[in-house]
Structures are given as structure tokens and as C-alpha cells.
Amino acid sequence: MRLRKKWWARPEIEASDKFAEEPKELRGKWNKEFNNNNDIHLELGCGRGGFISQLVEKNKDINYVGIDLKDEVIVYAIRKVKEKEEEVKREFKNIRFVTMNIMGIAEVFDKNEISKIYINFCNPWPKEKHNKRRLTHTKLLTEYKKFLKPNTEIWFKTDDKELFEDSQEYFKESGFNIEYITYDLHNSDFKENIKTEYETKFETMGMKIMFLKARLL
């Protein structure tokens, strides 16, 4: 489904100190942007910010970058973080948002700059000719490896079984070791889960959520 263009979105996100307008200029300088040397974690396809806003609140000593394609999505993610700040009465200085096509992500982050990646409920691109657009495809995993630190984890969640099983092969082919896997996350022994907006919706529909942790060897 295409998002209707919201002309007010761009001015609003540009007015936020949590928006990185020229991310390519920050390549190799993200710790300077955050004014600390803490680890930096990415959420690829952050949507409206329900997931990353919880991470930012829980982990003061980790920096987060949320990436999505559209201003019309990022604007709501920024609002979500502001709501969370008002709720806990604390400013979050450890979060930035970027609007970009993830295919060009290696132009934004430098070698060993990122310590963890989250990929939640990305587009499954079921047609074979579109498979290379999947955020877990070997083509993109190769790009992520250009800026991931050694021994880095990628956490991946989806409701799409075909994507999940294909992704297991993508990770293995790309030099990652799958350290944890479940086809029913909410009935598993994994205790660190933070639910996304989609996940909560799917849970009410009785759908099973699949999850894996893959570590870069």
C-alpha cells in the first residue's frame, strides 16, 4: 500500500534534533554526532517507532539509529519518541532517525561503526525477481558486513514463513551463525523480546511470530 504524500512531514522532521538530514556526511562520525563512544544499534525499517522508542528508554548507554524509506513514516517515529520522553520526563539524546533507501546503507556507516542490527517484519518480497530487495538477502547482508563490528548480532522477526526459511540460508551463506531460532516466539523461552506495533496486532489475530539471532563470524 502506497503512503499518501504528507507535505507537512518533511518540515516537521527537519525541525527535530533527532533527525539526521545528511546521513552520508556522518559516515565514520556517528559517535561524534551522539557525543559519546557508546555502541550504535540500527533498526532497519523502523516504521512508526514503537519498537525503537522502547529500546531507547531502556538502554541509556546505547545509541540508536532508526531507518525508514519515507518521511511520512519517520515523522510518526519522531513523534513516538517525543511521547515517550514526555511519559518518562526525560530527554532521549541517544536516538537519530534517517530517511533513506536501505540499499545505499554502506554509504552512511563506516567499518566497525555498528554493533547490532534489528530487522522487524520487513517486506517479504515473495516474487523471486524481487527477492534481492529483502532486507535479509545475501546482497544486503554483504553490505551490512562492511560496517558491522566482528561478532555482531542481527535480530530478525517476521510472520512470513517463506521469508524466514529463506533468510536462514541467506545468513548461513553470508558468514553468520544462527545462535537462536524459534517458529513461535511468544511461546518460546526467549525473554528479551520487545513487541512492535505489527507484532501486537498479529498476536491478537493468533498468528505465530518467528525469530532468530544471527552472529557474524
Curated annotation (Swiss-Prot):
Binding site for substrate: 127, 159, 196-199
Gene3D superfamilies the record matches: Vaccinia Virus protein VP39
Keywords: Methyltransferase, S-adenosyl-L-methionine, Transferase, tRNA processing
Residues the record lists as binding S-adenosyl-L-methionine: 43, 68, 101, 123
Positions of the UniProt region annotated as Interaction with RNA: 129-134
One GO MF term attached to the UniProt entry: tRNA (guanine(46)-N7)-methyltransferase activity
Catalyzed reactions per annotation: guanosine(46) in tRNA + S-adenosyl-L-methionine = N(7)-methylguanosine(46) in tRNA + S-adenosyl-L-homocysteine
GO cellular component, one term: tRNA methyltransferase complex
PROSITE patterns: SAM_MT_TRMB
Pathway noted in the entry: tRNA modification; N(7)-methylguanine-tRNA biosynthesis
EC number: 2.1.1.33
PANTHER family: 3-DEOXY-D-MANNO-OCTULOSONIC-ACID TRANSFERASE/TRNA GUANINE-N 7 - -METHYLTRANSFERASE (PTHR23417), PENTACOTRIPEPTIDE-REPEAT REGION OF PRORP DOMAIN-CONTAINING PROTEIN (PTHR23417:SF14)
Family membership noted in the UniProt record: Belongs to the class I-like SAM-binding methyltransferase superfamily. TrmB family.
Function (record text): Catalyzes the formation of N(7)-methylguanine at position 46 (m7G46) in tRNA.
HAMAP family linked: tRNA_methyltr_TrmB (MF_01057)
Annotated protein name in UniProt: tRNA (guanine-N(7)-)-methyltransferase
Organism: Clostridium botulinum (strain Okra / Type B1)
